[in-house]
Amino acid sequence: IEFDNKKTKTKSIETDYTNYQIIKLDWTETNLKNPIKTVIDAYFKLHLLSNKFVLPNTINLDGLFEALPNVVWTNKGPISIDEIEERLNKSKCDKNDLYIRSLDKFPCLTDYIIPNKVRIADASRVRLGAYLSEGTTIMHEGFVNFNAGTLGKAMIEGRISAGVLIGDNSDLGGGSSTMGTLSGGNNTKISIGKNCLLGANSGIGISLGDNCIVEAGLYI
């Protein structure tokens, strides 16, 4: 990917599979503002976010859920739901080496991108489309949705919901939560400033500025 004078590392892509196709996209800023209509649009925008070419909440993701199919994510890669039963039966007859990790529209971030200078204790809890700045640590109970993430070093032991941004040197304690925009009728995008702490099992439905502390167990 090459975008806004930045680009990912160059890699040559070769495949022996005749049913695979390498797709080249040539987008302008207008494409970023347009709703998502195809799977290609969806994956490209998610890659732009996770490669940190664009910040969360700055590109149009309308139509994302409609465009993405539900996929069986396995240790052998993505498999169509229509094919998984046959593949599982074949696996059991052979070495039984196929197992399912999830049934979801979104893959794990690390299936496609390895973020630089970031720790992720449980890769299944960070979706493709997450924006993780260098120095971020996601512990086992931490979760980061797509179109959300960190803007600096952060310790994440709670949930970063879709649309939420966490400032530099902030800490989300174990079991803490931030209200996203995907459910509950919330249209307000939540952000947390720098040097903030959400105590264990706390939560917020409002944005916080810098140097804020929310007591453990308290929901605001």
Give a label for each model feature.
Residues V118, S124-V126, A130-L132, T136-I138, ...:
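A structural motif detector for beta-strand N-caps
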Residues Y112-N116:
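Acidic-glycine-rich active-site phosphate/pyrophosphate-binding loop
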Residues I1-D111:
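Terminal amphipathic alpha-helical/low-complexity segments used for targeting or macromolecular assembly
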